Amino acid sequence: MSEHSFVWDAVQRVRTGAPLVHNITNYVVMNTTANALLAAGASPVMAHAREEVEELAGLCSSLVLNIGTLSKPWIESMFAAGRIAQSRGVPVVLDPVGAGASSLRTWTSLDLLRELNISVLRGNASEILALSGAGSRTKGVDSIHQAADAADAARELAGKFGCVVVVSGAEDLITDGSSDVLVRGGHDMMPRITGMGCTATALVAAHAAVAGSVLDGAAAGMGVMAVAGTMASRKAKGPGSFQMHFIDALYGMQSFDVEAGVEIVR
């Protein structure tokens, strides 16, 4: 099996299986995230009300906990949905948006990691460093570090919490603490578009729901993200059209696009 085969296999599994991805995510990205999941072949539900999250978590194939627009009721919903999802053995993916920027974001992320069985932690380098206790701060929700800067912190967090950690950047690092995968691809226009990291988290959740292992699912999700970015860059004239072409790329992606659009290093 080539290093690209597991990515294409996961793409096909998402398209045929249409996994239900329950997103407790932020107001900024709800529409973009839902459209990306639909284009990839998954089935999104965007629900955060405490009164229904347990019921929906009982149906989902994976759960996204994204702290981008955090508030106390949403924190309660995240814990409630997370407990149901973990009891069913479905992947729970945490996006610690802006961890390090405020105490609320940092401590909520750490509490979720401590109290739930998080399957995948996906963040930028500054967020991962902040959660590791390295003392990093973010520029708002943006990273001021490269993925390689957080490699040791990612492995430490993976070992401490028994999860896969994804550090996104120009080169993505995916690690379970003992095995690493590097994903290279995409385009430097991607950081100019709000919510691309949140889209990556949702794609990781969709592919983790169907892959043979959480590590492969996370790597496949980031690989798909990179391929779609590479494809979109060929047609886009700026961030606005890039986002449109990115969604189209998720929908139309073929095996030869995967072969040409991303480099996977194990």
UniProtKB/Swiss-Prot annotation:
Keywords: ATP-binding, Kinase, Magnesium, Metal-binding, Nucleotide-binding, Thiamine biosynthesis, Transferase. GO terms for molecular function: ATP binding; hydroxyethylthiazole kinase activity; magnesium ion binding. It catalyses: 5-(2-hydroxyethyl)-4-methylthiazole + ATP = 4-methyl-5-(2-phosphooxyethyl)-thiazole + ADP + H(+). Substrate binds at residues 46, 195. Pathway: Cofactor biosynthesis; thiamine diphosphate biosynthesis; 4-methyl-5-(2-phosphoethyl)-thiazole from 5-(2-hydroxyethyl)-4-methylthiazole: step 1/1. It is an enzyme of class 2 (transferase). Its EC number is 2.7.1.50. ATP binds at residues 122, 168. It comes from the Bacteria. Gene3D superfamilies: 3.40.1190.20. CDD domains: THZ_kinase (cd01170). Transmembrane segments: none annotated. Its cofactor is Mg(2+). GO terms for biological process: thiamine biosynthetic process; thiamine diphosphate biosynthetic process. NCBIfam families: PRK09355.1, thiM. Belongs to the Thz kinase family. Catalyzes the phosphorylation of the hydroxyl group of 4-methyl-5-beta-hydroxyethylthiazole (THZ). This is Hydroxyethylthiazole kinase. It comes from Oleidesulfovibrio alaskensis (strain ATCC BAA-1058 / DSM 17464 / G20) (Desulfovibrio alaskensis).
